[in-house]
Amino acid sequence: PPANSPRHCQMPAIPLRRSDMPRVFDHGARSYPLILGHEFSGVVDKVGEGVVSLSAGDHVVAAPLLPCGVCEDCLNGNYSLCSHYSFIGSRQNGAMAEYVVVPEANVVKIPNSLAMEQAATIEPATVALHAFKTSRFTAGKSVAVVGCGIIGLYAVQWARILGASEVTAIGRGQNGLDAALRVGADRAVSTSGRTEKEMQGLLGDGFDYVFECSGADATIHLAIATVAKKGTVCLIGTPKQPLSFTVSQWEAINRKECWVTGSWMSYSAPFPGEEWTDSVRCMCSGELCSDPGLVYGVYPMSQAQAAFEAIRSGAAKGRVLLTNEL
């Protein structure tokens, strides 16, 4: 392996992300051929020359971002904003293989007692925590989380861990809403069959912080409609379609003088950041968990095509994981 690059043997599991679907089915890969997989846990197989913090046999997770390290954003610790980055699983080969090469700086050790399937979901936990840091969250405030996928469920848990006064989960699918209650939401409200006005009537307009984890037109509108005056809307979800706003929807931002901020990826100084070390710590302590009720299926690597098809067809109503045998 290259200097300062440990080599990892991939262990169960490598979660499939919906963001990978365009790369597989819609010519969305940046280059071809490309091995996907940016969320993973593993066991160090070999270490490169000069590696001092890792040894063969260590259980680890790894941050997929490969920042340049020399631009102004990197020097300021804003690695997520690096314009010259590479990324494991999208800009270079990822973890859906027997081995993947990762720089030493990207690797975070985990205890052997932490299940690999659980550890493999740490990356979305770091994304959720980064949003709380970006939005300058303070304890004692009310939180709404819009969208109950994996990042939304971790946002619910971080809200509780970081001292929110109350946590409301908002979503469409009942599985996600049920999971949100299991992991710590005080209440879960379904958007199914309800207009924005009806939702606002149910929720009011008093949330101090709203974390939008879907990226859909309607959920962004709802986040703005239900945030408190002088409150904060943090946009985590990535839109897949053009967005539109009515005059009154946009004017609500002005009239409430609310703060709308984006949050991108999950890194801070020293790289990869507290987002990663805190997520590992809280997962090991049991404060943070990946709800098992949201796992649709576990597939061996030899059945990867079937796993991707389950997501594309809509059959998968939860997380899909690929596994490797050691």
Task: List the model feature ranges, each with a label.
Residues K197-Q200, G204, L243-V295, A306:
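C-terminal substrate-binding/catalytic core of Rossmann-like NAD(P)-dependent dehydrogenases/reductases
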Residues P12-A13, E49, L65, Y79, ...:
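Short, surface-exposed secondary-structure boundary micro-motifs
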Residues L114-G193:
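Mid-domain Rossmann-like dinucleotide-binding core that forms the NAD(H)/NADP(H) cofactor-binding site
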Residues P2-I14, F25-E72, P111-S113:
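Glycine-rich beta-strand-centered segment in the early N-terminal region that forms part
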Residues H221-A225, E274-L326:
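C-terminal hydrophobic helical "lid"/dimerization subdomain
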Residues C68-V146:
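NAD(P)H dinucleotide-binding glycine-rich loop of Rossmann-like/cofactor-binding domains
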Residues S135-A139, D178-C258:
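Glycine-rich cofactor phosphate-binding loops and adjacent beta1-alpha1 units
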